[in-house]
Amino acid sequence: MKFVIESLTKNSGRLGRLHIKDGAPGQRTPLLMQTTKGGSIPYLSADVFESHVTETPQLLELTLSTIDHMSEALAQWNSADRGLSDYIGFPGHLNVLLLRDPCETTPAGGNDRDIQPLFTRRGKESLSAQRYMEMVASLRPDIYQGLCDADTNAESAKKRVQKSVDRTEKFMHYIYEHKSKVDSTLLAPIVGGYNTFARTQSIKHALEQPSGSYGGYVFEGFHTNGLSATILDASKLLPIVEHCVGQLEEEKPRMVPGAYTPLTTLELIGLGMDLFDTSYAYCAAVNFKALTFTFVQDEVVHVPLLDITDDAIKEDFSPLLKNCDCLSCQKHTRAYVHHLYKTNELLGPILLMVHNLHHYMAFFEAIRESIARDGLPQLTELVRRQNGDSQVDYSIAPNRKVISKATMGKGFAAAAV
């Protein structure tokens, strides 16, 4: 993997191009990875995604907690002319393997000295560094993150934070020794919660490795995934990230998985982060929210989210978002999507997911254009206030309006918590 910085400014982050493997098109950064569950874009088939969301090859974010059961089959499937993306129905797309699903809350606890818990649909699995590398060798992703203990957040005690760093170093010592058996690019995990000393220790361990040991960094341990990322305190997060970035070399990409709000995402990009995912778009859709925040300068006051369960829109025949050219907004109305919610039709979350992904991908295109003209601060201020007088709230409240348990899973899903 090769990362080339094309533009670097003090106030607007950096533009780059990520070349993951020979023959594949380069990916422009800041990059939005497509979050998947079990190898699929939530609610969307590969055909729908490629025909109605984007035809451009994407970087798919796969999680071991949702595809661990595929490792045995993939050990027999993988060959020189086909791989993990082909197996899940996305040929031509690149992929990165993470441990935890950023869309769902990761349970706390279950940590052992030599074992990392992996919470799957079948329950908790015990994952040693050796077993992890065996699974990575079977799955053969294009990029994979190093095994780490990220069971920390803003409330974690100092002892828990230090244990997360020490256990991660132990896991990574084994992975660095055996990475030559895996023909994939490794991302070094940076953990340590909200403790600058612990984060520095984690960074030093990565920097001590021989040149070429890994291709980039993944920042973990700021939240427990799911909706927790949408409500974290950016005033605590940003100083820690700035502290870490100042110690890292410029020529390696930096990933921060999780459902960070659009505003926090912009602030992280301003500090030099490069790779994000679409878990925020999913968390909004699964909790009956359409993304309606603007990133185009105008004189209208906007709201960041549209609650499609609100009876006030039952006779509103306007699109989810004015001037949006996604399939959902071109062919359907707010009243119709509200009707789909009321009747628990499966088309409801499909239309919301199509819209949210389309809108969020357009948002990242606007981010790259803003960085190119050194205008990220202006975009950040627009997203912060939406032309209003005060900062808007991008947090996502859990869905509490499921019509009945008997219908859960048939249309709009239960809350992402």
UniProtKB/Swiss-Prot annotation:
Superkingdom in the source lineage: Eukaryota
Cofactor remark: Binds 1 zinc ion per subunit.
Pfam families listed in its UniProt record: TGT
GO molecular function: metal ion binding; tRNA-guanosine(34) queuine transglycosylase activity
Keyword Calcium attributed: no
Gene Ontology BP term (one): tRNA-guanine transglycosylation
Coiled coil: none
One cellular component (GO) term of this entry: cytoplasm
UniProt-listed Gene3D superfamilies: Queuine tRNA-ribosyltransferase-like (3.20.20.105)
Family listed: Belongs to the queuine tRNA-ribosyltransferase family. QTRT2 subfamily.
Self-association state and partner proteins as the record states: Heterodimer of a catalytic subunit and an accessory subunit.
Protein name: Queuine tRNA-ribosyltransferase accessory subunit 2
Lineage: Eukaryota, Metazoa, Ecdysozoa, Arthropoda, Hexapoda
